């Protein structure tokens, strides 16, 4: 378990890892008895970004379930290498935590797993909110060489991208934009 940290004034996370039927997941669940709002973060984020995305959720009325999607922070990429596997991982996380249903709030690259979760597990979803989400399908081009495939489809590649973003954000952003 990572140390609790305050992300914004009044918003803290206490991330921990749970083993699900689909693999390990880093998550944070706020206290309370209310309905659950599950947050699927975008690219370059994790459990921390997910929690900040849910800052507007009434903490007295709802519980916020934030997670790191596969390949981000404490969740290994092997826990969900496809959109469908990530959707099933969301269901497995609910199972492991003993939760029946959740509203899903997604942002950016967190959209496709959220959409797939709602399609594959409709009985587990009581609401779906998409904030500036990716809504198309982006597949690895057939022309992508082994280095590009290794960077975008392995834990080591994801760690290297993260390190590049930390060490040289100027180069990282130049490649994206």
Question: Language-model segments: which ranges?
Answer:
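Flexible "cap/lid" loop of the alpha/beta hydrolase fold
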Residues: 128-168
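N-terminal cap/lid segment of alpha/beta-hydrolase-fold proteins
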Residues: 3-29
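Conserved acidic catalytic loop of the alpha/beta-hydrolase fold
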Residues: 85-103
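Conserved HGGG/HGGXW glycine-rich cap/lid loop of the alpha/beta-hydrolase fold
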Residues: 23-76
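Conserved alpha/beta-hydrolase catalytic His-Asp/Glu region
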Residues: 166-177
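Conserved hydrolase catalytic core segment
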Residues: 100-144
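Active-site acidic short loop of glycosyltransferases
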Residues: 32-34, 95-101, 122
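Short glycine-enriched, charge-decorated loop/helix-capping segments at active-site entrances
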Residues: 77-82
């Amino acid at each position: 378990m990572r140390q609790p940290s305050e992300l914004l004034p009044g918003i803290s996370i206490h991330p921990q890892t749970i083993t699900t039927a689909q693999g390990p997941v880093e998550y944070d669940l706020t206290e309370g008895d209310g309905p659950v709002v599950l947050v699927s973060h975008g690219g370059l984020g994790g459990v921390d970004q997910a929690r900040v995305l849910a800052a507007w959720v009434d903490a007295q009325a709802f519980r916020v379930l934030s997670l790191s999607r596969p390949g981000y922070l404490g969740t290994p990429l092997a826990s969900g290498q496809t959109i469908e596997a990530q959707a099933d991982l969301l269901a497995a996380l609910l199972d492991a935590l003993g939760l029946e249903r959740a509203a899903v709030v997604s942002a950016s690259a967190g959209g496709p797993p959220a959409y797939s979760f709602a399609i594959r597990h409709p009985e587990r979803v009581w609401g779906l909110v998409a904030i500036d989400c990716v809504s198309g399908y982006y597949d690895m081009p057939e022309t992508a060489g082994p280095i590009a495939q290794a960077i975008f489809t392995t834990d080591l590649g994801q760690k290297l991208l993260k390190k590049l973003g930390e060490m040289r954000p100027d180069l990282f952003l130049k490649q994206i934009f």
